[in-house]
From Swiss-Prot:
This is Dihydroorotase. The active site is at D247. Belongs to the metallo-dependent hydrolases superfamily. DHOase family. Class II DHOase subfamily. Zn(2+) 2 binds at K99, H136, H174. It comes from Shewanella putrefaciens (strain CN-32 / ATCC BAA-453). Zn(2+) 1 binds at H13, H15, K99, D247. One of its GO terms (molecular function) is dihydroorotase activity. The keyword Zinc applies. The modification N6-carboxylysine is found at K99. Its cofactor is Zn(2+).
């Protein structure tokens, strides 16, 4: 297959950052994506409706002329978030979900939730008003090996939340393990998951074997090949519970290439092209449209996009860097070729 036309896709998990960087991140993701779920882990985080709506306005101001791109906003949950704030956010019409960051789990998560029991009243309110619950599924206990933190979170925390709030729609974000695939597959229809392009294309050998490659360092961290294969199997299965979420997370080049580098991989420059590569690798290009364009809006009870994009099997070379505000970001596949491009 050398051309494939699909309904315009959406990105159900992205980091757009703020300030001078917004112009560049919004330009990249709005080229082919119709909508994106925008992460709220800014500095300071978007912990209330006013902050999230102000962020929405800043994003919209950077959308290029002619683009219909629509950001979908998310509330950042803290120990102090109130049920009233959830109701207010839902009523805004712009905020479609709230996000659990276990405190310290990832970039700018220090304001996050210290004990999930602290937000049970909030989860009850979310269940009542029909707001989605997005989860960074890792424990933060330093005694737990970093490669085990997703599995332990599912076993010790997420399984309890799912049991206690059966009507709450939950997205386990950027899953990285067979454990997560199995959990989501076996859970009720109210539990779904996003999968990144880089977790489909790469495993920890790419990051660690033959030298450390810091631009593959992200959280949750890349796992072993057997987990990568489970993710590919889930994405290509046609199962409606799995959908596209890039978790594209830009950091300046010097913040990645450092003695203590930041976690995050940038894929917004070529998101759908990279997913096409991943699906082609398992002979499943016929399943790409459902994963990229149908399953996400269906789970969120939003309409599917009405227009299409066409991907062509035509190699192109990725630049070594892209502009990111007043600095540069090194994208995934920097200086190398990608097999697909959008016509």
């Amino acid at each position: 297959m050398t051309t494939i036309t699909i309904t315009r896709p959406d990105d159900w998990h992205i980091h757009l950052r703020d300030g001078a960087q917004l112009k560049d991140t919004v330009r990249d993701i709005s080229r082919y994506m119709g909508r994106a779920i925008v992460m709220p882990n800014l500095v300071p985080p978007a912990i209330d409706t006013e902050t999230a709506l102000a962020y929405y306005d800043r994003i919209k101001a950077q959308v290029p002329a002619g683009s219909q791109f629509e950001p979908l906003m998310v509330l950042y949950l803290t120990d102090k978030t109130s049920p009233d704030e959830i109701r207010k956010a839902k009523a805004s019409g712009k905020i479609v979900a709230a996000k659990l960051y276990p405190a310290g789990a990832t970039t700018n998560s220090d304001s996050g939730v210290t004990d999930v029991k602290n937000i049970y009243p909030v989860l009850q309110a979310m269940q009542e008003v029909g707001m989605l619950f997005l989860v960074h599924g890792e424990v933060t206990d330093s005694a737990i090996d970093i490669f085990d933190r997703e599995r332990v979170f599912i076993e010790n925390i997420l399984s309890k939340i799912v049991a206690d709030f059966p009507a709450l729609k939950i997205v386990l974000e950027h899953i990285t393990t067979k454990d997560a695939v199995d959990f989501v597959t076996q859970a009720s229809d109210n539990v779904a998951a996003t999968i990144t392009a880089h977790h489909l294309l790469y495993n920890r050998n790419h990051m660690l074997a033959g030298g450390i490659r810091p631009h593959f360092y992200c959280l949750p961290i890349l796992k072993r090949n057997t987990h990568q294969q489970a993710l590919l199997g889930a994405a290509a299965s046609g199962n409606k519970k799995f959908f596209l979420g890039t978790d594209s997370a830009p950091h300046a080049k010097d913040k990645k290439e450092a003695a203590c580098g930041c976690a995050g991989s940038y894929t917004a420059h070529a998101a759908i092209e990279l997913y096409a590569e991943a699906f082609e690798s398992v002979n499943a290009l016929d399943k790409l449209e459902a994963f990229a364009s149908f399953n996400g809006p269906d789970f969120y009870n939003l309409p599917r996009n009405s227009d299409t994009i066409t991907l062509v099997k035509k190699s192109w070379d990725v630049p070594a860097t892209y502009p990111l505000g007043d600095t540069n970001v090194v994208p995934i596949r920097a200086g190398e070729a990608i097999d697909w491009q959008v016509e």
